[in-house]
């Protein structure tokens, strides 16, 4: 539950400057779109790095904790190393996916009185454009968070490898943060469709290097 609330809080904070008490009574056509604004925040690295940190805190830090508490020898008595690692990596992936999707949906529920889930249905949403001017836009919010989760999973895997070599919780979280920025900046010069920024921001049409405003 900690990870879900962390993700939801980050998502709400990322668009907090666009919400006000007065907006609750505004007509839907005057409200900002939750999907539009959350997608804008995912184009840049400011809040995306916080999602990586949240995922690392709840997953990668278990490796140094288990090593320090000598838990691994007891696990290996019941299973072999490969099975143990495969199960752990699968658990990390499943946790991140569930946490990101549930956290974004929770943020959407909180933001819904101040904003609207529907959007203009911009062509930047690609094949999902028909969904965006109806309540079905919640589906896109799920896809957006799933897309983000899939991009964070390999970052956490690399951070886990560092955490095994250097069993320290702070190193584990820092490794995830460092790996994220390496990917973010070193892929920045690649074509948009191949950049890490694109892969983590626009599941509808990742090849378009534009931001929805």
Predicted features along the sequence, with ranges:
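Central hydrophobic cores of alpha-helical transmembrane segments
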Residues: 2-9, 169-183
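Extracellular/periplasmic helix-loop-helix junctions in multi-pass membrane proteins
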Residues: 186-211
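Short loop-to-helix capping motifs
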Residues: 1, 78-81, 167-169
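Secretory targeting signals
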Residues: 5-61, 86-165, 202-213
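Helix-loop-helix units of permease transmembrane domains in multi-pass membrane transporters
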Residues: 61-94
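Short basic/hydrophobic patches in alpha-helices and adjacent helix-turn junctions
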Residues: 161-164, 180, 184
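Hydrophobic alpha-helical transmembrane segments in multi-pass membrane proteins
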Residues: 12-13, 101-102, 183-191
